[in-house]
Amino acid sequence: MLVNVISMVLSFLENVISVYGEPISDWGTMAEKVLVTGGFGLVGSQTVRRLVDDGHRVVVTDLDTPAQRKAATSLPANAEAHWADLTDKREVDVLVAEVSPTVIVHLAAVILPAAYRHPQLARRVNVDATAALLRAAEASEHPPRFVLASSNAVYGSRNPHRHPDRLRVDSPLQPADLYGAHKVVVENLLRASSLEWVILRLGGVISVEPGAMPFTGDALFFESALPTDGRIHTVDVRDVAAAFAAATTADVAGETLLIAGDDSHLLRQKEVGLALAEARGLSDVLPAGRPGDPDSDENWFVTDWLDTARAQQALKFQHHSWPDMLAEMRAIVGWKRYPMSFVGPVVRQLLKRQAAYRDAPGRYADPWGAIRSRLGEPRPDSSD
């Protein structure tokens, strides 16, 4: 929530002060040809950069929009764009046939909270498009390794009072929302395929860049609905990119791995918001929020702490601690932290108006009820 608000404010302060991909060409001899879906998103853009830095040839695919075309002009050397709508099976078949990748890193998805407001689109992208991509990959003359982005949402609601241990790969899968259910479906599709596969279940991905995440009323409302004492295991997006890049070649075929930061990233929901606000020069701007009900297994969100030992051993991706991220955020904001104090009251009122429990009765958070009231039904439907 704070990342979005701060992004808007910093952009304002800055103002006060101050290709289409052709058919894949001859790239020469390099390690792998990696197709990255959703390659212009938060995780995708960092993953593309890391793959190129590691010496791979990268083909980035995403929807053909003006914003994506503009982003494509900044792709690094040894990366190029190939536009495709993954919900169109014919375009998927053409994409995979023309690129002929040795590895597919599948990041394209409708994530939260947009998936709640657009459930049919979310299923087409998260499930149907993934299934089409898997079929096209299996039909390739040289089937690629398939690295799938999944989520800790597959485990469902997590009451830390009743579940004190960290989540493990073999913890029961009990998705509580449609996004988690979608990820369970595509994980199973991938395991049932004939492809060499790797699944990475991600924790709470955060960027140090103020403008990295979109600013929307839905996002503010959504984040304010989460229990303030809910556990969340954050991770720097650059470390997520490092994990995906490593997974393209590491000896982890057939493994599911949990991707989150080192132990400094074992946080509570409220801690994250307060720390991000302070790093950007904003204090006392968060609405009070509500804790989760310790006697309920349902009224909690789908985040928790993860056992990342095996993933770190295999992929060696944890490079940015939580304190280091906060220090970097302060450095990026620099002198602008000081005038931020003057806009604090405006930000406070903005967040208060978007708060999920404003004027609502009750003591404890009800994330699913709040989400349902504004964004739509979050629970899995029968097709999930």
Regions found by a protein language model. Give the residues of each.
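Active-site Tyr-X1-5-Lys
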Residues: P160, Q174-V198
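Mid/C-terminal beta-alpha module of Rossmann-like enzyme folds, strongest
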Residues: A243-A314, H320, D324-E328, K336-P345, ...
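NAD(P)H-binding glycine-rich loop region in Rossmannoid oxidoreductase-like domains
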Residues: W83-V125, G156
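NAD(P)-dependent short-chain dehydrogenase/reductase
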Residues: N188-T234, R238-D239, G273-A277
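Glycine-rich NAD(P)-binding loop of the Rossmann-fold in SDR/ketoreductase-type enzymes
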Residues: T87, R117, L121-A132, L173, ...
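N-terminal Rossmann NAD(P)H-binding glycine-rich loop of SDR-like oxidoreductase domains
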Residues: V34-D54
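Conserved glycine-rich Rossmann-like NAD(P)H-binding loop of the short-chain dehydrogenase/reductase
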Residues: H56-Q68
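Conserved Rossmann-fold NAD(P)-dependent oxidoreductase catalytic core, especially the SDR/UDP-sugar
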Residues: A131-L178
